[in-house]
Amino acid sequence: MNKFTPALILALAAGTFAGSSLALTSAEYSAARDRINADYKAAKAQCDKLKGNAEDICEEEAKGKRNIARAELEQQREPSDKNARAVELAKAKATYEVAEERCDDLQGEAEDRCEREARAAYDAAVERIRGK
C-alpha cells in the first residue's frame, strides 16, 4: 500500500493544479453574469406579487443572492484570498440586510433589540472575515 501513496499524492496534486488553472473565458463569464442578472430579475418579479414588508424582505433576499453570486463568480474567475473574503462579506451583508428588513415587522423595543442583534451579528462576521 505504501507504494501507491506517493503516486496518489502526485496525482492529486497534479489534478489540483490543473483544476485551479482553468479560468473562465470572457464568453463564459459574460454568460454567467447574464444568468445572475436574469435570476435576479425573475426573483424580483416574484417579489412584486407580495405586499408590504414581505415584499421588502423578498427583494433583500433576491439582492443578497445576486450579490453573493457575483462575488462567487469573481472568485471563480480570479481565485484569490481577496475574492474569497469578498464572497464571505457578501454573505454576511446579505444576511444582515434580510435580518434588518425582518426587524421591520416588529415594533418598539423589540424592533430596536432585533436591529441591534442583527448589527452585532454582522459586525462579528465582518471582524471574523477580516481577521482571516
Briefly describe each language-model feature range.
Residues 13, 18-21:
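N-terminal signal peptide c-region/cleavage motif recognized by signal peptidases
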